[in-house]
Amino acid sequence: MSTLPWIQHLVIVPVLLPLIVGALLIPINQTRYGLKFALGIGSGLLLWMVSVALLLMADGEHWPAGIGVYLASNWAAPVGIALVVDRLTAMMLVLTSTIALAVLVFSARRWDRVGVSFHSLFQFMLMGLNGAFLTHDLFNLFVFFEVMLAASYGLVLHGYNLRRIQAGMQYIAVNLVASLLFLIGVSLIYAASGTLNIADLAGRAPALGAQDTWLLQIGATVMALAFLTKGAMWPLGFWLPTTYASASAPVGAMLVLMTKVGVYAVLRVWLAVFGAEAGGMSHFGLAALTAGGMATLLFGAIGMLSSQDGGRMAGFGAIISSGTLMAVIGHSGTAVLAAGLYYLLGSTLAMAAFMLLIELTERIRPPGSAMLALTMEAFAVEDKPEDPVGVGLPGTFTFLGLSFVVCALVISGMPPLAGFVAKFSLFHALLAASPEAVPWTTWLLIALMVVGGLAAIIALMRLGVRIFWASGVVKSPPLQVTEAASIGGLVALCMALTVQSGAVFDFLGRTTEGLLRSQDYPQRVLGEQPVQRVPQTEVPR
């Protein structure tokens, strides 16, 4: 290939676009809300379109084996930086850009005006998220994690008050320790193998000597602690409920995505490096991951039942989701992973919608409510009076109530929506994976998933009764059209995921089959050659 077709450069757009837009937003005056929102929403729309294009390319015949490789600065891997797109990466990019768009629309005329630099930090967070999904080497994964976290530190404190500052400081301290563990783990892996490229590491790991194998496993374990801290695995996820309850609604919705990055990193690295072809290190640590996932699931279920606050319930719901996904990764297999990815899609969309919905439902409750007082305190940081929150739209109670029910059903896994489809598929896949004698650990996982679902529906219905039936409020709460549109869009996607479950499962089946063909990645990543520049012929004078 003598020249690089322009369409191949789409791979780097999800990283470059938010970086450029975030930098452009910094010098713009803080009072120019309309211009900042226009740039932010324009970036979000373009990111969504690029992500969908990458998904179509990965699922089509554009790239061999459905894997696209982009060599940054035209340096070949493993020395150069390689960005890799497959079906899983593209799916996560589409999910991220979809939720980001909903959050940006929700934030218009309210949360983007409480505090400073909301849109810039939001773009830098998107850069870190997208880069973490795209990169194929461990050091750049660390770099993108830090970009994502640095932006999230500012966003968690956005619209600051005492409670938010306390939770934010805890969040920052925990993630700084996790980042240190990440860096130590990466250093140990490099000392053992001499490479940080994931595809190259997968090829070198089986040939390592006993001492280097031991060092590699220690490094992977330390690095996994960092991933699992960000993914909220018990007991490392103690920080999450308080942070969710204290963060502003748009930031809480993005934190739902950030917990999934930790789970994604474990899935990506472990399937590539410790897959079926890893020799003696095959499936290293998966039993511990399964046990930790089940413990996380139980912890989340107990936490939901004990919570009275909607934000804390959302936090424990995210912990249940992470625990389920971690336990599923431990039970590797095409059908199990496909069902797990379907569960990831449904739970993430529903949890993001629920985080946005919580703020709107707080407007129904009496002014003495602790959560409403917290929100009012956050808005009081402005020197000037706040703009009106919105108007009482017709059917507001009906819209909020139906949206709440849909989110509750999907989060808990109750029929007939996507959460139930995901859990039923997981049960079937887990039982079918052991046709002769089903291990007791599988039965325990299924039981814990049922318990987690029951705990979630009990807690959420209790919250719903308190908000919609026992609040004593007759007047419709103020609501902006943009807020209703963002929540309605996410709820509609949850419904569409249910209706189109067959097509989605077909795609996820192809995704997991590609992931389990781990030999394709070294061939594509290490086999990709730099573009040969065409020499320019000198024009005779």
Role assignments for model-derived ranges:
Residues M1-I12, A23-F122:
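Transmembrane helix-loop-helix hairpins at membrane boundaries of multipass inner-membrane proteins
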Residues W6-L17, V85-T96, L138-A151, L216-T229, ...:
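Structural signature of hydrophobic alpha-helical transmembrane segments
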Residues A247, S369-L402, G453, I457-R541:
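Cytoplasmic/organellar membrane-interface segments at the starts of transmembrane helices
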Residues G22-P27, V52, V105, M127-G131, ...:
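Alpha-helical transmembrane segments of multipass membrane proteins
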Residues L155, A205, Y244, W270, ...:
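Interfacial segments of multi-pass membrane proteins
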Residues M223-A287:
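Short helix-boundary/re-entrant hairpin motifs in multi-pass inner-membrane proteins
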Residues G22-Y33, A100-D112, Y153-A167, G231-Y244, ...:
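C-terminal ends of transmembrane helices
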